Amino acid sequence: MKKQELISFLEEFAPKQYAEHWDNVGFLLGKKEEELSKVYVCLDVQRRSVEEAIAHSCNFILSHHPFIFQGMKSVTGDNEQGRLLLTLAEHKISVFSMHTNFDSVKEGMGDLICSKLSWKKEGVLQEVSPGLEGISQGIGFYTRVDKAFSCEELAAYVKEKAALPYIEYFDSGKPIRKIAVCPGSGKSFMKDVIALGADAYITGDLGHHDAVDALGEGLSLLNAGHYGLERFFVPYMSEQIRRHFPKIDCVEEEEFFVGKIL
């Protein structure tokens, strides 16, 4: 099987036009006409993931976050990105990334996390294009729950459902029924969430001033970390590939929370 066959499947699963204008998704490194051996699926292309891909004889890496994001003027061994690119090329390992396009499509990140939390999606935070067959497509989602949570109860619920080692929460003191979620880094949608009338917002990469501003608007915040919710991309896309290509072996990145809390 050629790499092109897998690339075509991935491009159909999460079309490039659903990506944000600033994003860099798709086939980023390699030759499409080469034979595919094994696929390594990860969140980020970093030293440990490249070494694991080599150790497992994988010649194709599927990542969520794009490895090549901003313009590069040279590829040398003087920095880590250059060293990794040279290593990947030396071992003929291709790289394909599905980022905000995966976040936006039906059966992508939003639906995945909504299912993981056992909720029903009512809509998205930012529509990317008109929904197909009446289904809203876009980044993030919001839902309503029948029984109100306290902020502490919601934090405990999300921590258990998402198997998180830790979660940070900022309590407005209001009962929580309408909940907005954006896996990864969603602080840019804070105003949209407030305008939506949400009682709580679950996302990652939140800081002190984000919390102060949100609490002032009566919005509770849950900081699940950037990796906390997005890490489910790895087993989910591995399963999608196995389902469509039963003869292709997928190696999944082991869970690795970069940050540690004492």
Predicted regions span which residues?
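Active-site catalytic microenvironments in core metabolic enzymes, especially phosphate/sugar-handling
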Residues: 1-262
